[in-house]
């Protein structure tokens, strides 16, 4: 009996331990969900600041934010607040990040008795002052005012001064304070800033820092010229690729199967989903004149059946959201696919055929595109994209296409003595007034990597680097003048940059050049002569910034 009693007590104890462990697990899991939710939802920490009640929306993750049904319900809550009471300049409605798409953002709503334009200044201890004039779609001077404030510093008190100026120049001000949530992805509010030798003024705007892998969570940061993070846009599990502003909408990717448009107030007004298709986004997209999204993609069915990736162009209808294939590169470059049979060994596409690796797309017209193919170190122009795609030309060293079908016939003639681009990224089209004549600028990675053809000779690419970031090599900003009328291209500008074998971007902005040497986690701005004005560096241990572009956000957040 004593033995049976001992066994019973042991069994009972085991059950209690098991139940206790289960309860602890459930509590920890619930706590984790709560913590996740709390990092997304704002706190009304400031004078006259209101926070919406989200308890009925079941928001637990970033993916919940980017559901249009959720956003519609949030908009209804805001509308109810606005209609229940009249808000004046003295007693305005101020909401903390109501749409949850900018960690440090504020929503303002009020009316003025006179038509006024609204400007604001943000001050926070130890940081530079941020000032802007707000864009009002009702006109420069208006009586009805609804805005999103960009520029607050996360996790510390900000003093915000709003100024209303009427058409006679008379001003009225209102000042209040607010402490936003801390940043979701970073512990620091400022990047490391290093001054260069150039005395040229930095270009206007905010740097959109896209795909910083040193962060705890995926976000896109808007960074000012002093390196301070002025906005944090959360994304789900992917880079936003780029920001495209058109028709009072801001397009960005939030996952590899979802793009959205935001309005100037931060509301998600449309979501484009690829979840029910066999496509995944990668690298880049453009928006045509009809509001359709033309994107680079991977076909997941072909990835499974043929082990190939990153060689599709798709169209997402801007109205219906319907997804259709525009181009499979294998159909256009069949002879290349017969030759390039090697398997990717270096990137997240290990084990797959990455024959093209298209990494940027530019629309010259709605049915004409310029594609950057990293794997072939080639820039391709394709016409009749939406009907019967046709290769117009290639820009590359002739050695890449020697003995591969008849594609050498597509090569433009190189004018001058320089080494053609290798492993390039961020190819950007800049038109001129002459038909068939334009510029192409790019980040020339100068990386000698081609897993699909391991026997390829890089003899025509002296001093090219390998797959590891190293001070022994250099990348470059390249700017070509392309003349389709003469079938030629020439290098008209070059700036030496820190070496980055993968990723990276460039952009001409206000006659300066913005560059991102992605695998050094450094972006910078250079003057027209190629002298460094200033560089910015993230402080995380992982050195990887996908792309950096600079935007003014005029006629969106800010007035011209």
Regions picked out by a protein language model, each given a short descriptive name:
Residues 128-140:
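Solvent-exposed serine/threonine-rich low-complexity stretches and specific carbohydrate-binding patches
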Residues 11-22:
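Hydrophobic membrane-insertion alpha-helices, especially the h-region
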Residues 1-13:
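N-terminal Sec-pathway targeting helices
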């Amino acid at each position: 009996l004593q033995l049976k009693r001992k066994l019973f007590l042991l069994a009972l104890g085991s059950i209690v331990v098991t139940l206790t462990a289960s309860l602890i697990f459930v509590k920890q899991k619930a706590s984790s969900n709560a913590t996740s939710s709390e990092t997304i939802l704002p706190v009304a920490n400031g004078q006259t600041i209101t926070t919406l009640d989200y308890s009925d929306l079941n928001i637990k993750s970033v993916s919940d934010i980017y559901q249009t049904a959720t956003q519609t319900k949030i908009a209804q809550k805001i509308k109810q607040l606005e209609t229940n009471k009249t808000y004046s300049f003295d007693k305005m409605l101020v909401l903390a990040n109501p749409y949850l798409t900018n960690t440090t953002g504020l929503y303002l709503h009020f009316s003025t008795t006179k038509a006024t334009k609204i400007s604001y200044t943000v001050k926070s201890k130890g940081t530079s002052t941020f000032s802007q004039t707000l864009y009002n779609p009702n006109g420069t001077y208006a009586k009805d005012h609804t805005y999103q404030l960009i520029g607050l510093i996360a996790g510390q008190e900000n003093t915000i001064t709003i100024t209303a100026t009427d058409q006679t120049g008379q001003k009225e001000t209102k000042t209040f304070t607010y402490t936003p949530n801390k940043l979701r992805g970073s512990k620091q509010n400022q990047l490391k800033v290093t001054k260069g030798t150039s005395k040229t003024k930095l270009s206007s705007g905010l740097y959109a820092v896209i795909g910083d892998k040193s962060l705890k969570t995926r976000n896109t940061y808007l960074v000012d010229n002093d390196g301070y993070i002025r906005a944090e846009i959360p994304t789900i599990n992917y880079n936003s690729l780029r920001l495209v502003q058109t028709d009072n909408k801001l397009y960005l990717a939030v996952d590899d199967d979802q793009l959205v448009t935001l309005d100037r107030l931060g509301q998600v007004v449309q979501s484009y989903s690829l979840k029910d298709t066999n496509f995944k986004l990668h690298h880049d997209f453009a928006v045509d004149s009809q509001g359709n999204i033309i994107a680079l993609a991977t076909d997941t069915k072909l990835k499974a059946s043929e082990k190939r990736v990153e060689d599709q162009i798709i169209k997402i209808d801007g109205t219906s959201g319907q997804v259709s294939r525009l181009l499979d590169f294998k159909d256009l470059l069949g002879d290349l696919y017969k030759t390039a049979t090697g398997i990717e060994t270096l990137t997240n596409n290990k084990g797959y055929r990455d024959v093209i690796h298209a990494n940027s797309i530019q629309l010259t017209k709605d049915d004409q595109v310029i594609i950057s193919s990293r794997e072939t170190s080639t820039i391709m122009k394709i016409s009749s994209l939406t009907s019967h795609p046709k290769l117009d030309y290639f820009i590359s060293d002739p050695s890449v296409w020697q003995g591969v079908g008849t594609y050498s016939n597509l090569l433009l003639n190189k004018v001058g003595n320089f080494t053609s681009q290798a492993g390039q990224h961020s190819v950007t089209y800049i038109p001129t007034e002459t038909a068939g004549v334009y510029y192409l600028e790019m980040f020339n990675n100068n990386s000698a990597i081609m897993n699909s053809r391991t026997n390829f000779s890089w003899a025509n690419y002296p001093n090219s680097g390998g797959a590891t970031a190293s001070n022994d090599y250099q990348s470059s900003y390249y700017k070509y003048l392309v003349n389709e009328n003469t079938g030629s291209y020439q290098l008209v500008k070059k700036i030496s940059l820190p070496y980055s074998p993968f990723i990276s971007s460039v952009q001409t902005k206000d006659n300066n050049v913005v560059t991102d040497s992605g695998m050094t986690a450094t972006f910078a701005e250079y003057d027209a002569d190629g002298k460094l004005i200033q560089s910015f560096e993230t402080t995380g241990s992982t050195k990887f910034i996908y792309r950096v572009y600079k935007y003014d956000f005029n006629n969106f957040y800010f007035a011209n």
